[in-house]
Each structure stands twice: as structure tokens, then as C-alpha cells.
């Protein structure tokens, strides 16, 4: 009898992608989660993966249990039931560590840019060679016969430590997750431990001072814009259609590349993809062709229009990510008003980075803040509010409520950049409904 894989917390971005992969490999897959809608569930529903509410009755001794990393006995009935009855289970990252052993695996790690870079690498490679992949936007593709496996490698709580891939990209090291990491030294230590796991090659952003500190058994190839980088981008052109550059490996030109994406960070993402593919011996003409057709990943600078109004949805929830997203918006829409609509994610992060949030939000023309979205792991001690953050922003800044987003209407031909990792999409939907009352041209 074919084994059934049960995912507790299947709507999580990594969990849903892994479930899709196993389903495509012909496995029996089901999962449970909150009944609230989350954008990752659409792909699961389209292929017929059963989605159940949390219930101890979902757990059977013969099932292979895969548990989301956020769940414990005290917050989930299924894991409590499994523990009580002695049923074995694996955490998401533990299962993934075993899964990748059957492939030549390529991880993408970094405080920022993991999902976009994983998506770009997966798109390019899967169009050239049989490649399975797991992307942090909930997208996954699985084929047991694939030669390569591309996946997102998360540093939070050192979840990437069970991973021993052949290769990895490291986009950057930055202090995030202040509820877990003590500071930048702690984060750097985690990346050093992960670097020791890599078997054949590390591709790291050369202008990151902490990545330059790493040592490893595998060779480290640095990429960037500087003369001391192994892989270097030159002749960079950024315009309203995207970005183009020439790529060099240790002084030798390996190709000209165009990426229909915006922001300096996406040029670096593309260069890291070029570096990996070049090292693997893939044809650079093929790589260039498929970079040109990359259309992004979910919730990363995702655009739509309501009449003349542009709405951009992005997962950005750290100052570095907000800065990159607003830079991308300026590149594509240099002559229009940039309106930032940001929901701070977790009280610990908002407290830790309040000044930095205010500084980068000033890159917009106008700023609106939604109420802080607290995580299930923390308690609001009323140490900071959205209004406190608004008071730090120099540009015009207001706090808006979900039941009244009408202040957002005060901008003609605005480019609205909705950013956050909580429920900012609810504000976005409310705004779209408000706009649609005066325009039916929803694209």
C-alpha cells in the first residue's frame, strides 16, 4: 500500500511547495491547516491535494508525518496527539534534508532575496535540464528522475543545518529574526556552520563583509560589481523595461544577459544564477534566453492595475527589503508618485528596526502604515505601535485601518507598494474594491 504523507501546517510556503513536489512525484499527499485563506493553497487545490482543518483524527500511525516548524504540543492538537501516542514525525527541514540526498542539490540562502533567486534559478535550470525545485512562494515541482534539486535554504532557528547540498548561493548576511538571533555575529556564525556543510561550491555576494569572512572546505566564488569578484557584472543598464549586463568570470566574458526585473538586487540575483549555471557547465546562450522569460515569483513585486492605478504586492518586511522594493518601483515608474503601504511584521522586529524602517520608508513619496502584525510566537507588551513608527517617518505618514482604507484615494496615478509578511493583502484587497467602484478596468 502506498504511503500517505500528512503535512501539519500545509499552507506554509515551504510546506505547500514540498507537498506539491511529492504529489507530482506520484505520492499520496494530504494536509491540515487553519481554515483562513492563504495564497499558497490555490496550487494545492488545483491539483486536488486534500486540505483539512486541524484535528487529531487526521493522524494515523501508518502516515509519514511532516510537521511545520512553528507547531508545538501547546499550540497544535495534531502534534500533541502524535507525541502522546508515540507516532514518529519529522520537521519540515529535517524531511527536506533527507529528501535532497537523491539529487545534485543547490540551496539558496541569505537574509534577503532567497525566494526571488530560488525562483529565477529554478526557472532557468528547469528549462535547460531536468530540475525539481522548492520555492518559498509555495511553488514546487517534483520528478524522481531529476538530476538537480533547487531549494530555498532558511537560516531562521538554523533550519538549514540538516542540509548538505552540493552547491549553495548566499545572497547576503543581515541581522533579522531578533526573536532568535542575538545579533549579526550570531547570524554570521550560523552561515559559517552552513558553509561547512556544502560539498562542491559556494556562490556568495562579494560586497557583503560578513560573507567575505566565511571559510569552507568547498571553494567560494564571489559575485558582484567589484574587480575582486570571481563573477562580475559590467556595463549595467537599468531602465523602465528591466536591466541588462555583461557577465565576466575572472576577466573572461561569458555572456550578455537581460532580466525583465527591477532593482539592483535583481541584477545580483541574476548574476548569482549565471554563476551557478556557468559552474555547472550549462550553455550560457540557453541561460540568457531563459533569464529573459523569467516573470518573477509570488508576492515579490507582483503588479496589477486598476484603471491608471498601479498596485504592487511584495513580501518585504525588513528595512533592506523595503529599500530594494522601493528602488525597483522607482526604476520602473520614475515619473510617478510612489506610495508605500507597509505593515510591520512582529513586535520584536519593529522594536529592533524602528529607526531603520523609518529611514527606508522615506524613500517613498508618501507612507501609510497598517497595524503591526504580531506572530503566534510573541505577546504584545505595548512597547511600540504603528503610530510610533509613523512619527519617526519624515515623509507624510498616516496609520490606516482595514475597515477604512479611503485615505489611500488621495493620490492621482499613484504607484501603491503594499509590503509586509502578515495580512497586508487584506488591505490591498480592500483598496482594490474601493478603486473598482470607480473603475471596472481591472487587469
Curated annotation (Swiss-Prot):
* Catalytic activity from the UniProt record: UDP-N-acetyl-alpha-D-muramate + L-alanine + ATP = UDP-N-acetyl-alpha-D-muramoyl-L-alanine + ADP + phosphate + H(+)
Q: What is its EC number?
A: 6.3.2.8
Q: Which residues cross the membrane?
A: none
Where does this polypeptide localize?
A: Cytoplasm
Cross-referenced Pfam families, in alphabetical order?
Mur_ligase, Mur_ligase_C, Mur_ligase_M
Signal peptide (residue range): none
Pathway of action? Cell wall biogenesis; peptidoglycan biosynthesis
Any one Gene Ontology MF annotation carried by this entry is:
ATP binding
Superkingdom: Bacteria
What InterPro entries does this protein's entry cite?
A: Mur-like_cat_sf, Mur_ligase_C, Mur_ligase_C_dom_sf, Mur_ligase_cen, Mur_ligase_N, MurCDEF_pg_biosynth, UDP-N-AcMur_Ala_ligase_MurC
Query: What GO terms fall under cellular component here?
Result: cytoplasm
The first-level EC class reads ligase
* A GO BP annotation: cell division
Q: Which residues bind ATP?
A: 110-116
Question: What keywords are annotated for this sequence in UniProt?
Answer: ATP-binding, Cell cycle, Cell division, Cell shape, Cell wall biogenesis/degradation, Cytoplasm, Ligase, Nucleotide-binding, Peptidoglycan synthesis
Give the family per the record.
Belongs to the MurCDEF family.
Q: Extract the NCBIfam families matched here.
A: murC
What's its job?
Cell wall formation.
Stated name of the protein: UDP-N-acetylmuramate--L-alanine ligase
Amino acid at each position: 500500500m502506498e504511503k500517505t504523507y500528512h503535512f501539519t501546517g500545509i499552507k506554509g510556503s515551504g510546506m505547500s511547495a514540498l507537498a506539491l513536489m511529492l504529489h507530482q512525484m506520484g505520492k499520496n499527499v494530504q494536509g491540515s491547516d487553519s481554515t483562513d485563506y492563504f495564497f499558497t493553497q490555490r496550487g494545492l487545490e488545483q491539483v486536488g491535494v486534500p486540505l483539512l482543518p486541524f484535528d487529531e483524527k487526521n493522524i494515523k500511525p501508518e502516515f509519514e508525518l511532516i510537521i511545520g516548524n512553528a507547531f508545538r504540543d501547546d499550540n497544535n492538537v495534531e502534534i500533541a496527539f502524535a507525541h502522546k501516542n508515540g507516532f514518529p514525525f519529522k520537521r519540515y527541514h529535517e524531511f527536506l534534508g533527507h529528501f535532497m540526498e537523491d539529487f545534485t542539490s543547490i540551496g539558496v540562502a541569505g537574509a534577503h532575496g532567497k525566494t526571488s533567486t530560488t525562483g529565477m534559478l529554478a526557472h532557468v535550470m528547469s528549462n535547460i535540464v531536468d530540475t525539481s525545485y522548492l520555492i518559498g512562494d509555495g511553488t514546487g515541482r517534483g520528478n524522481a528522475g531529476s538530476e538537480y534539486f533547487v531549494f530555498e535554504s532558511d537560516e531562521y532557528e538554523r533550519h538549514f543545518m540538516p542540509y548538505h547540498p552540493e552547491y549553495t548561493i548566499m545572497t547576503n548576511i543581515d541581522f533579522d529574526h531578533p526573536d532568535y538571533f542575538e545579533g549579526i555575529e550570531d547570524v554570521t556564525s550560523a552561515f559559517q556552520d552552513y558553509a561547512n556543510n556544502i560539498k562542491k561550491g559556494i556562490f556568495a555576494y562579494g560586497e557583503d563583509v560578513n560573507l567575505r569572512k566565511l571559510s569552507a572546505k568547498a571553494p567560494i566564488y564571489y559575485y558582484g560589481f567589484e574587480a575582486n569578484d570571481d563573477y562580475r557584472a559590467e556595463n549595467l543598464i537599468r531602465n523602465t523595461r528591466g536591466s541588462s549586463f555583461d557577465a565576466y568570470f575572472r576577466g573572461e566574458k561569458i555572456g550578455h544577459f537581460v532580466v525583465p526585473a527591477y532593482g539592483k538586487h535583481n541584477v545580483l540575483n541574476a548574476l548569482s544564477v549565471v554563476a551557478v549555471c556557468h559552474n555547472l557547465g550549462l550553455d550560457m546562450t540557453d541561460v540568457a534566453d531563459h533569464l529573459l522569460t523569467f516573470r518573477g515569483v509570488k508576492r515579490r513585486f507582483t503588479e496589477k492595475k486598476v484603471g491608471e492605478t498601479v498596485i504592487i504586492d511584495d513580501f518585504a518586511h525588513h528595512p533592506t527589503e523595503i529599500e530594494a522594493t522601493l528602488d525597483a518601483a522607482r526604476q520602473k515608474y520614475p515619473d510617478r508618485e510612489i506610495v508605500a503601504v507597509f505593515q510591520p511584521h512582529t513586535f520584536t522586529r519593529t522594536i529592533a528596526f524602528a529607526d531603520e524602517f523609518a529611514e527606508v520608508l522615506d524613500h517613498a513619496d508618501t507612507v501609510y502604515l497598517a497595524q503591526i502584525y504580531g506572530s503566534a510566537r510573541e505577546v504584545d507588551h505595548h512597547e511600540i505601535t504603528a503610530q510610533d513608527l509613523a512619527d519617526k517617518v519624515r515623509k507624510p505618514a498616516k496609520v490606516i485601518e482595514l475597515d477604512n482604507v479611503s485615505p489611500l484615494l488621495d493620490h492621482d496615478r499613484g504607484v501603491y507598494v503594499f509590503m509586509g509578511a502578515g495580512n497586508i493583502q487584506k488591505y490591498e484587497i480592500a483598496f482594490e474594491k474601493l478603486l473598482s467602484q470607480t473603475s471596472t478596468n481591472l487587469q
